[in-house]
From Swiss-Prot:
Any one cellular-component term (Gene Ontology): mitochondrial outer membrane
Source organism per UniProt: Caenorhabditis elegans
Organism phylogeny: Eukaryota, Metazoa, Ecdysozoa, Nematoda, Chromadorea
Reactions mediated catalytically: L-kynurenine + NADPH + O2 + H(+) = 3-hydroxy-L-kynurenine + NADP(+) + H2O
PANTHER family referenced in this protein's UniProt entry, alphabetically: KYNURENINE 3-MONOOXYGENASE
Cofactors: FAD
Family from the record: Belongs to the aromatic-ring hydroxylase family. KMO subfamily.
Subcellular locations according to the entry: Mitochondrion; Membrane
Protein name: Kynurenine 3-monooxygenase
Cited InterPro entries: FAD-bd, FAD/NAD-bd_sf, Kynurenine_monooxygenase
Keywords assigned by UniProt, alphabetized: FAD, Flavoprotein, Membrane, Mitochondrion, Monooxygenase, NADP, Oxidoreductase, Pyridine nucleotide biosynthesis, Transmembrane, Transmembrane helix
Amino acid sequence: MPSVAIAGAGLVGALNACFFAQKGWDVSVYEFRKDIRTMKHVQGRSINLALSQRGKSALEAVGLKEYIVNQGVPLYARLIHNKDGKTYSRQPYGKPGEHIVSINRRHLNEVMITQAEKSPNVKFFFEHKVKNVDYDKKQLVVQCTSQPSKIPTFGNKSPPQEHAEFHVEADLILACDGAYSAVRRSLMTIPRFDFSQEYIEHGYVELNIMANNNEFAFEENVFHLWPRGHFTLIALANRDKTFTVTIFAPFSEFEKHMSTSEDVLSFFEENFPDAFLLLGKEHIADTFNRVKPQPLVSIKCSPHSFFDNLVLMGDAAHAMVPFYGQGMNCGFEDCLVFSETLEEYGNDIAKAVKVYSDGRVNDAHSINDLAMYNYEELKDLVNKSSYKLRKKFDTIMNSIFPKSWIPLYSMVTFSRIPYSEVIERRKRQDKILSRIMTTTSTLALIGAAAGIYVNRGKLGL
């Protein structure tokens, strides 16, 4: 059977292992961390994940959708918390019943690793760091960072010694090693490989609201949002009745208003009074004493495939800011689209990797841009009357033209319409709306002029 070597056992790497296990391929996965299933605490991001249609479709293809969805908390709307801490407004995500699912990142990752390992042809190699790619041999260069271990027979004559580097040969290489991908970095000298990286001015800090007498402290089936202009607080429910709370703010804001315990407590009490009471002074102060704000990066690159057997996927190809909840969903859709492409081309790897990259780059760039736009919506626009009017207009148009007029959020979240097509559809909607507004304004102006003419005598004109 064909063989695939996967760099990274995170969300996208683990899901790819599940896909290729189904296909019967020989699968080897190399991960620099220890097995997270054996660890008490896992370093790295823990922002809760919002599973939507694209991610669900990928999980369904490997038989995990139902189980994973049942492990999460459904969210049907945004709940906007006003600054007084007492009043709220609710914005449903889509049509009645449409929802996203709040999922714990670590649990999801563990489930997929365990699922993939059920296949005898799948091997995970933890504490094995992918260093780079050997261009000439089209192989991964891996370093064993702990004790020697058995390495798959393809391309290796003997197990490596501790800290020794070795080459991994496979018919297909999938780089799923994250935003700071070692594989992608080693490809940077290849001519015509385009790459861009942007750190936004905002960072984030995570906190937790504990269960209240074994009950949720807030309403659980909504996405809690405290939009305050240039900074924002969000909260998502977990199955254990806790909430993961995240504050996004410019680094300058963290330095100015959250650098001491006294300052951060005053800041939270003033801007998020209801959350402040549930988080508690001690937890807020302790968290900000221990944790520094983490950066947020947006990465684009093109192409996503190299040679005739290597593909970049997930954050290695398109790291994005988390404000559309599509980082995981896009990465999972990468796995699904590539699997579908391989099947379409009869497992012709060389053809499949090129076709995949040609089609996926534009989609990845598109959702990257949409994620940046959605932060403007989350931190400010949701409270503006123009945004609310547009949302109502989209809802009305969708009820009249359900197939041809789909709201932007619904296209991204509740469909598998390619991201690039989503943007084109939105542009057409904007043009139509602009014409309607122009026509309406013109008619209103003509009507006003006619009224003035009829009443010119009374008006002394």
